[in-house]
Regions:
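Glycine-rich phosphate/ribose-binding loops and adjacent secondary-structure elements
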Residues: 1, 7, 18-49, 55-60, ...
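Intrinsically disordered, low-complexity boundary segments flanking structured domains
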Residues: 36-39, 68-69, 267-277, 427
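Context-gated lysine
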Residues: 99, 124, 176, 243, ...
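Active-site/ligand-binding-proximal alpha/beta "capping" segment
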Residues: 436
């Protein structure tokens, strides 16, 4: 980034930004700077205290969480000391004219030509005013509220029940997983530990998701408190083709803003219709049917995944910028491919073909019904997840008054989206990850 023409502080601010998403008192120009650059480069959230220099300027920056120590001293003869602990040098206390510590997301910079310390606000204020980032965002970034509303489709109880059978929903899953989140907008609270046999040795059919487990941060990478430290976290992201990292322009932020990694059925419908009239070619959508011939068994599954990967390559070459992997419309002959298997296959195929930055991946799936499933899909390459059957199940429970009483169907669906998104935040926090862009 520095060799590409950006100043050293500019490059550092792009790579290790402060937590701007939930900061309501941040200068709007600086906020626009960070929001613009978040659309072209994912943040690194540490934990780290990173030092840098180009021979003329030398400095340090602390991660957005402030999870690494950084203290500095300035003496009256011009000596500057920055270290992780106090007392690394035996300095005469009478000679110290200034001392302090690096704060979360703040930068400490010395200019050896100007012989001065450049303050954090001066650095960032100057960089934020270099370009009209707020105007670029206004003209380039597309938000859901800017898109026209479409008619909401209501599915019958029989339709929901049939598809629950297709995806192997059990009464226990509906009652203990989907119903609580549809009712309250939060995961059901349970005790620690489980006596369920691990998937690898279970004698019952299990979802592919069950073969994976969550990790948690230990020792050098401390976990976060997703409730009390929510201000430094973010579930927002962008979707669309990524432009040249070394040539910033208004087109660099021509993307769709996603406030949550989980989207509901109406939001997915909006995305599908974005370029319906051909006036938004940068958001051309290609839908891939993730279904395979059941009679063909494993060979048919492999052949279908290979065919889907080839189809995605052709679609991106033809201008598609949003790929939707959908397992809707299954029947007695065509079964849904496990969404985790399909997502991982397509994501890594696009990486190998150098196409991944040219298109976003949305997974429209019926086999997702809990937070762990969403977290896995995001970790395996999905930009956004639409758990349509979980949403329709929540609506159906509210409409029928079964397990979910006193909640409107639309509210139940929104609760599912909110609860799954907040659950992903909790999973990220256990790993010490602050932003969903750093988690993917």
């Amino acid at each position: 980034l520095h060799l590409g023409g950006r100043t050293l502080p500019h490059a550092v601010m792009m790579m290790i930004p402060e937590s701007w998403e939930n900061d309501t008192v941040m200068d709007p120009a600086r906020r626009a700077f960070y929001e613009f650059h978040s659309s072209i480069m994912e943040a690194w959230d540490g934990p780290a205290c990173v030092t840098f220099t180009d021979g003329t300027q030398i400095g340090a920056v602390l991660d957005r969480n402030g999870l690494r120590p950084g203290r500095f001293w300035v003496t009256d003869d011009g000596l500057v000391v920055l270290a992780s602990e106090a007392g690394v040098l035996d300095l005469d206390q009478a000679s110290i004219v200034r001392k302090g510590r690096l704060e979360p997301g703040r930068m400490f910079l010395l200019d050896l030509e100007e012989h001065r310390i450049i303050e954090d606000d001066e650095i960032k204020g100057q960089l934020a005013s270099e370009h009209p980032y707020d105007e670029w965002l206004y003209s380039g970034l597309v938000r859901f509220e800017d898109l026209p509303d479409l008619e909401h489709i209501v599915h019958t109880h029989a339709s929901v029940t049939r598809r629950q059978q297709v995806f192997g929903y059990t009464e226990e899953e509906v009652r203990k997983l989907v119903a609580p989140i549809a009712r309250t907008g939060a995961e059901a609270i349970g005790s620690m530990g489980t006596d369920t046999p691990i998937a690898a040795i279970s004698d019952r059919p299990r979802q592919l998701f069950d073969y994976f487990s969550q990790l948690f941060a230990q020792v050098t990478n401390p976990p976060l408190d997703s409730i009390r430290e929510e201000i430094v976290t973010s579930l927002a992201g962008t979707m669309g083709p990524e432009k040249n990292l070394l040539d910033p322009s208004p087109a660099s932020c021509r993307m769709l803003q996603l406030p949550f990694p989980v989207i509901d059925n109406d939001e997915l419908a909006k995305i599908r219709h974005m370029n319906k009239d051909g006036d938004m070619p940068g958001f051309s959508v290609h839908v891939v049917r993730g279904l395979y011939d059941v009679a063909g068994g494993g060979r048919a599954l492999k052949e279908k995944i290979d065919a889907i990967c080839a189809d995605v390559s052709r679609a991106v070459a033809d201008g598609a910028r949003i790929i939707v992997l959908s397992d809707r419309h299954s029947n007695a002959d065509l079964a849904p491919i496990p969404s985790l298997l399909l997502t991982g296959a397509v994501h890594h195929h696009m990486v190998r073909e150098k196409l991944r930055t040219q298109a976003g991946l949305i997974v429209e799936t019926g086999d997702v019904r809990e937070v762990h499933h969403v977290a896995l899909l995001i970790g395996f390459g999905a930009t956004a997840v639409n758990p349509y059957l979980a949403l329709e199940t929540g609506e159906d429970l509210a409409r029928e008054g079964v397990f979910v009483q006193g909640v409107e169907p639309a509210k139940a669906a929104r609760n599912v989206v909110y609860g799954l998104g907040k659950g992903v935040l909790k999973v990220m926090s256990k790993m010490g990850v602050s932003t969903v862009s750093s988690y993917t």
